[in-house]
Regions:
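C-terminal lobe and pocket-closing loops
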Residues: 122-134, 147-249, 281
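Short helices/loops that flank or line small-molecule/ion binding pockets
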Residues: 9-18, 103-113, 117, 249, ...
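Flexible glycine/proline-enriched surface loops and loop-helix/loop-strand junctions
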Residues: 20-27, 62-72, 92, 110, ...
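Glycine-centered hinge/linker elements that transmit conformational signals in sensory
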Residues: 9-14, 53-99
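Extracytoplasmic/periplasmic substrate-binding proteins
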Residues: 38-41, 45-46, 80-174
């Protein structure tokens, strides 16, 4: 399996056979949020976060984000390598790639028309639970292949559950109890047994019953022990949604051939700087 971006491109090229309706790879390339996420993840694959975070062992330090002393780092050498990598991926992608997001990408993979795909484990049931899918039982799971000099990263996604600030006081204990139940090992195992392919608990992921259901759990556990599961590729700052949208617009123009990579990087950086100026200094 490919562990570097160069090896990934070589594999995609070898597996790409459009005359037979087979394409090498799929990824989120739809305009806006979908492609914006892809650029952030590609940037991480080349060893750089979207913010000027200080490096630490195993990644980058996100402990001081609340101080708001950061800037976005898009127009960089790593940014250019990431942009050029996306252009290379385009060569071995299906013709509708520029309108593909999460679901549009996983469906043709499950149907066997795409050899490889980037994706979160959340959508793995599309093929793992489909006995008619060619991908069922024939899929392996890897962290993102890394660019030259970088380490493999598996970006963490997920959802946050919390208590609304306006919740009446008398309802708080029941809400807290519900959160405890939802996130308990027993509930997490029940989700997996009923089709879920995500799990935030080590104890459940190492449960033999769970391990037998899908190879995902052993693969993700191994990524965690290798310190490959990281959330710095998509740092939780107030501006991140707008920055993702900006990247998804400018790099979509690049993939369509409207502007070159350097221009896409410059435009995205200028727009990101304007966002920072607006949010941090007003």
């Amino acid at each position: 399996p490919p562990t570097t971006t160069d090896a990934l491109l070589n594999a995609a090229k070898a597996l790409h056979d459009p005359k037979r309706g087979q394409h090498g790879i799929a990824w989120n390339a739809a305009r806006g949020t979908a492609l914006g996420h892809t650029f952030l993840m590609a940037l991480a694959d080349f060893g750089q976060p979207i913010l000027d975070l200080p490096p630490i062992a195993g990644g980058f330090d996100t402990r001081h984000l609340s101080e708001r002393r950061y800037r976005f780092t898009i127009d960089t050498d790593a940014g250019l390598r990431a942009a050029e990598f996306l252009l290379e991926l385009l060569k071995y992608s299906p013709p509708e790639i520029l309108s593909m997001s999460w679901y549009e990408r996983i469906r043709p993979y499950a149907a066997g028309r795409i050899a490889m795909t980037y994706g979160y484990t959340l959508l793995a049931p599309y093929f793992e639970l489909d006995k008619n899918s060619p991908a069922q039982g024939n899929t392996g799971y890897l962290p993102h292949p890394a660019g030259s000099g970088a380490n493999p990263v598996a970006p963490v996604g997920g959802y946050i559950m919390g208590l609304p600030a306006n919740l009446p006081v008398d309802r708080v204990p029941a809400a807290v109890e519900a959160l405890i139940v939802f996130t308990s090992p027993a509930a997490q195992k029940l989700y997996v047994q009923n089709g879920s392919r995500t799990n935030p608990r080590y104890s459940v992921g190492s449960d033999p019953d769970v391990r037998r259901i899908s190879p995902i759990f052993e693969a993700v556990d191994a990524m965690s022990w290798r310190d490959e599961l990281q959330f710095w590729p998509r740092p939780p700052v107030p501006e991140i949604g707008e920055i993702i949208q900006i990247c998804g617009e400018e790099f979509h123009n690049m993939l369509r051939g409207i502007i070159p990579p350097q221009e896409a990087l410059r435009r995205a950086q200028q727009r990101a700087d304007a966002v920072i100026k607006k949010t941090q200094f007003t």
